[in-house]
Amino acid sequence: MNFEVVRPKTLCNRLVVVDGLPGCGKTMLSAVISSLERVELFKYSYEIEVQCILHHFKKADIDTSASLIQYHLDLIIYNQMMARETNFRYSDLSSVFKSVDKLKYFKRLFGPGDEKVPDIIEKQKPIVHLVTHCLSAYSNPLLDNFKN
């Protein structure tokens, strides 16, 4: 039996990925990228890295991996827009306090949530910002979601 995973509507339609070896300056570059208009704070997503590697080693097909990655990207932006899983630890590199627009993230704590979030995402068009480790050679399932 063949099944196709179909999700007609997605939330994450914009993505920037900073990829590289450990210690090569991804965090420094990500601080600059996060300061650009509409770009969210950077986030590490090991779940996405694992899906790409599973596909590379033929433990998951491209459709399954791409669908799970899109689901996870949608979950990331949905949670970010409600300040869920947002880092408020003052000294962390991915902290709100390192952002040029700290107020934006504090407002989200008290803003509308749940069913209003997809409309907010549609209106504001935020850009998910991922930092990955040595993923470029295995990134087909991720790139499959952004063919256009």
Regions found by a protein language model. Give the residues of each.
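Pre-Walker A adenine-sensing motif
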Residues: 1-9
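Short, glycine/acidic-rich beta->alpha junctions
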Residues: 10, 21-25, 130-137
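Pre-Walker A (Motif I) flank of P-loop NTPase domains
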Residues: 12-15, 126
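Hydrophobic anchor at the beta1->P-loop junction of P-loop NTPases
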Residues: 18
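A conserved segment at the C-terminal end of the G1
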Residues: 24-40
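Short catalytic/ligand-binding loop motif for oxyanion handling, primarily in non-cytosolic enzymes
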Residues: 25-27, 48-52, 136-139
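PAPS-dependent sulfation machinery
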Residues: 45-129
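PAPS-dependent sulfotransferase catalytic domain
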Residues: 127-148
